Amino acid sequence: MASIFTRIIEGELPADFLWKDDACVAFLSNRPLRPGHTLVVPRAAADHWLDLEPELLAHLAATAQTIGIAQMAVFKPSKVGLMLVGLEVPHVHFHVVPIRGPHDLDFDNQDPNPDPAMMKAAGESLRQELRRLGAAGAL
């Protein structure tokens, strides 16, 4: 059975995409920890990050870094957190989260009903910044 991320990548489920390239996609989390919380997901499904080819893992990290640079410019957080957990969805994904402190990385703080206007504004601002940066996969 295809993971929820495979279904999003294939267009079966909606997502607010920020990035698409041949190896991965990035889209806003629908249960954000903070505004701008983005998921970086390889197109090829793998359950565990240790199963990824080193080149793909490096590409995911570089993409996450570029997303994080855009988040710093847009949201002005103290830091950008990066998590690779892999417990809820059997498809490797990086969480890239603009944070003020460690409490912002607690999944108990996810917003299950984020404000649609806030989500739209976050996506538009991040896409604009990624394009300004000249990021190859920016939409």
Label each region the model flagged.
Residues M1-L139:
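HIT superfamily nucleotide-processing domains
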